[in-house]
Regions:
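Glycine-rich, positively charged active-site loop/lid region within alpha/beta enzyme cores that binds
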Residues: 2-63
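Charge-rich, low-complexity amphipathic helices
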Residues: 26-28, 34-35, 44-45, 88, ...
Length: 125
């Protein structure tokens, strides 16, 4: 995506940057949703089967990094996008002030090269 956006001279705009909440660290392998929640449908693969397991591995790395640098998991996820896709715009929804504050922690700093490499590697597995 980075190469394409650079070649076309467009700014990447990431919608659903926290994966409908999966990258906030609040869900585990036993997650279930009400029938009226769109994430309960199989079309939302991030919350089902092998894709869920893969995403939870990414979340575990996000949690390790967030503990190491004293930032929220969502802040690390957002910062990863901003650092990996330079000049990108992140859209992340919130339901309450705590989520907003957690997301705001992504501002004013950068992930280390080591953290970016770890997250890039695990996301490509």
């Amino acid at each position: 995506m980075f190469d394409i956006s650079k070649r076309l001279e467009v700014t990447p705009l990431t919608w659903g940057s926290l994966g409908q909440g999966i990258l906030t660290g609040k869900y585990d392998k036993n997650v279930t949703f009400e029938a009226n929640d769109r994430r309960s449908r199989d079309i939302y693969v991030n919350f089902h089967g092998e894709k869920l397991i893969k995403n939870l591995k990414i979340v575990e790395e996000l949690k390790k990094i967030s503990n190491e640098i004293d930032k929220s998991v969502s802040a690390v996820a957002i910062r990863w996008i901003l650092d990996y896709l330079s000049d990108s715009v992140v859209i992340a929804g919130v339901k309450n002030i705590n989520q907003l504050n957690g997301n705001r922690e992504a501002l004013g700093w950068n992930l280390s090269e080591e953290h970016i490499k770890i997250l890039e590697m695990i996301s490509k597995e």
